[in-house]
Design a protein with these regions (language model features):
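Flexible coil/turn residues that form the inter-helical turn or adjacent wing/linker of helix-turn-helix
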Residues: 2
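Residues that mark the N-terminal boundary/hinge immediately upstream of a DNA-recognition element
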Residues: 5-6
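Feature marking well-ordered beta-strand scaffolds used for ligand recognition
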Residues: 9-25, 31-441
């Protein structure tokens, strides 16, 4: 790859994807959501089946183990287990709850164990008149209703298909965990809130003794330790770790409006910052999912769209050259879906990326991405400077709104995707259950 100036590329990308680009994009997309059938529409992806997850359609992160799917919920305070031995007919077989007002929406499966995020059901404890309040305020300033909940990391034995038996719980005083990364092994990398901090920070957990997990380190951006008197982060911006993904002795972390960091984690008890880059401004922020492609020394980083009807402009997924980890450089963005006007209702833009977990579909050339309102997108990134969309699937509009927050549009909220090595996908939507799809590439 030729040498590229980070500042130059940010300026170029900002010019290409600014307000003028949004206007031109909107004019070029004409099809409406009303013409999407129940099985969705797409290219290169076949619809296999649909499940309302036993009447709990608010699905978020998906894990797969021993022919069973484990799905965390956004609003239902629990985890549903589905028998996926026949992908054409998913069968709910069990439901775990950590208790009322405890959200367990994110989880990680490896080595016949399931690690589950436990934290405040934030939606039930906030008082905003629209969704943007959650994304534009620190977590501690968002909570206006005090309720009892469980905060910390629960560990479950899932060696018996269809069951999850809790074998350990690590309490984390605060509002709890948002998301975590654990592909197996000794250490889990957790995004958690602790009392005294403004929002979720990095917490490294040692699992050497699985029944006695132990916190060995914490790391945060300057300004997040309110109890220590650190100067406040910018008002109207949310600096918070969404999550970290590791590759070897490097950790890649997304901090919402706080940008993107790369860490040396060769000593998990002492993670060291190598670089910190933030493209907001000029972009809208919401940096959400950091997917390293270590063999190619690239990272794919998705910014989560978080405003109704594109009120903040378009959000993007960036391709970064990380050959020099002390100086990551944005070199491209994944193409924005254009076959219809996705800005007319609800939120439109990137959400998650399939994370190349061990045992799942793994590729540094084919990227699976989920989009609010625009379903699943598959990209060819063999030319990192010119990614191409090679397949897509768009879901129908949900029949009803599950999200209890006010002023939320009735639109698809395609959330997460787990892709098996054979290309079979389990795709969640926090309003509309789960679709099973088959990638045909």
């Amino acid at each position: 790859m030729p040498q590229v100036s980070r500042r130059r590329h940010l300026q170029q990308l900002s010019g290409v994807f600014g307000a003028a680009a949004l206007s031109a994009w909107s004019r070029s997309a004409s099809a409406s959501e009303a013409d999407i059938p129940p099985e969705g529409i797409g290219k290169g992806i076949q619809h296999i089946s649909y499940s309302d997850i036993g009447g709990r359609p608010d699905s978020v992160q998906v894990m797969f183990n021993r022919q069973h799917v484990y799905v965390g919920h956004m609003f239902s305070d629990g985890v549903t287990i589905l028998d996926a031995s026949d992908p054409r007919a998913l069968k709910p077989v069990n439901f775990f709850t950590a208790g009322q007002n405890t959200r367990t929406h994110h989880l990680q499966a490896a080595e016949d164990l399931l690690l589950v995020a436990n934290g405040a059901n934030i939606v039930a404890m906030q008082s905003y008149d629209n969704m943007r309040g959650y994304f534009e305020n620190t977590l501690v300033d968002s909570i206006t209703k005090t309720k009892k909940f469980r905060s910390g990391l629960s560990i479950h034995d899932i060696s018996k298909p269809g069951e999850m038996r809790e074998i350990a719980f690590l309490e984390m005083p605060g509002f709890g965990i948002n998301r975590l990364w654990w592909p197996g092994g000794r250490y889990a990398y957790v995004s958690a809130h602790f009392d005294g901090f403004t929002d979720h920070i990095l917490c490294v957990v040692d699992l050497k003794t699985i029944t006695k997990p132990e916190i060995v380190s914490k790391w945060w951006l300057p300004g997040m330790n309110r109890a220590a008197g650190e100067p406040a982060t910018p008002k109207g911006k949310r600096f918070a770790l969404h999550h970290m993904i590791t590759a070897g002795d490097r950790g890649y972390a997304a901090w919402r409006d706080g940008g993107f960091t790369i860490h040396d984690i060769s000593d998990p008890a002492n993670p060291k910052l190598l670089s910190h880059i933030n493209w907001s401004p000029p972009f809208a922020g919401g940096t959400h999912t950091p997917l390293p492609l270590p063999k190619r020394q690239l990272a794919i980083v998705a910014d989560e769209a978080n405003a109704e009807k594109c009120a903040k402009g378009l959000f993007h997924t960036f391709v970064l050259d990380v050959r020099a980890p002390e100086n990551p450089v944005p070199i491209a963005t994944l193409p924005t879906p254009r076959e219809r006007d996705f800005c007319t209702n609800g939120t439109f833009g990137p959400h998650n990326l399939h994370e190349n977990r061990p045992g799942s579909f793994q590729s540094e050339e084919t990227i699976f991405a989920t989009y609010n309102n625009a379903g699943v997108r598959v990209f060819d990134v063999r030319d990192a400077f010119a990614p191409k969309e090679i397949a897509y699937w768009v879901p129908p509009v949900p029949k009803k709104l599950v999200d209890p927050r006010p002023n939320i549009g009735l639109a698809a909220k395609t959330c997460d995707a787990y892709v098996r090595p054979d290309g079979l996908m389990f795709v969640s939507d926090w309003n509309a259950g789960m679709h099973v799809l088959q990638y045909q590439g």
